[in-house]
Amino acid sequence: MFRLDELAARLGGDVVGDPATTVRRVATLEQAGEGDLSFLANPKYVGRLKSSHASAIIVADSARSLLGEKAGIVTRDPYLYFARVAQLFNPPEAVAPGVHPLADVAVAVPASVAVAAGASIGAGVELGEDVVIGAGSSIGAGVRIGAGTRLAPRVVIYPGCVIGTNCLIHAGAVIGSDGFGFAREKSGAWVKIPQVGRVVIGDDVEIGANTTIDRGALDDTVIGNGVKIDNQIQIGHNVRIGDYTAIAGCVGIAGSTQIGARCMIGGQAGIIGHLTIADDVVISAGTLVTKSIHKPGVYTANLPVQPHADWVKNFAHLRHLDSLAARIRALEQSPDHPESA
């Protein structure tokens, strides 16, 4: 439980109303009640603010007057402020250090490390202070994991990979499996190319459940600092992702693509291999990227939803674009066309 003036002292912001107002959790404007702290980040929800029963509301300076008699905190970015308050109210679960008797650990680990039942830690592994290894996780030989990193149950880290400090890797993620590398014989048979690179992950990275990041063929696959990767994402071998890029669920990134810093990639986007994407690029959900992107900006290549009957009619026209274009060119070249006179 915090008073508003205590929150402002920790996180900044201007308190409106009674600074001794206490809040015990964060909640949406609709669901908030006595003792709850809510926030208004989007002006279209002003109506919900007016009817909210929250004890206090976080708002931008432009919405200060909307608080009326309600208590609140005024800040430049209400959504970011809400995120920081939510961290205060919901700290990571405390985990007792120690190695479970049913864990298979081949190395000495710091006393502050927690290794759960069924986990396996191979030879030559280096774990930093306060690392947590979840139940059933497998850490291959020679892996290095930085201080404060947490692995949920059943995470697999293949041999030789490097994980930075204060990372969070969710259940079922696989780091360092073989990249998809094969050479083809004249007969059509495939010859596997050994994947001898590593996966190197920076600090403060979060990797979602059931995401797979392939090890490099020769060079490493590299994930920069502060990168946020959602669930069920496939990252191919030799990919390099710049600092603070965020990638939403079900994205596929083919091998040897380089993605810049601070990019945002929407869900189910696909990026083919050997491309370069500049810093500060936003790729809309469902977009297929087939060419390199050299300038910052928002890029979209998909069709918005529409009634099926309309889609069928529009697609019928799409199938005949070549003939329609030829007819237009013929009309433009006709002696009867106004511009040909």
Curated annotation (Swiss-Prot):
Alphabetical keyword list: Acyltransferase, Lipid A biosynthesis, Lipid biosynthesis, Lipid metabolism, Repeat, Transferase
Segments traversing the membrane: none
InterPro entries: Hexapep, Hexapep_transf_CS, LpxD, Trimer_LpxA-like_sf, UDP_GlcNAc_AcTrfase_non-rep
GO molecular function, one term: N-acyltransferase activity
Catalytic residues as annotated in Swiss-Prot or TrEMBL: H237 (proton acceptor)
UniProt enzyme class: transferase
This enzyme's EC code(s): 2.3.1.191
Pathway: Bacterial outer membrane biogenesis; LPS lipid A biosynthesis
Description of how the protein assembles with itself and partners: Homotrimer.
Name of this protein: UDP-3-O-acylglucosamine N-acyltransferase
Lineage, highest ranks first: Bacteria, Pseudomonadati, Pseudomonadota, Betaproteobacteria, Rhodocyclales
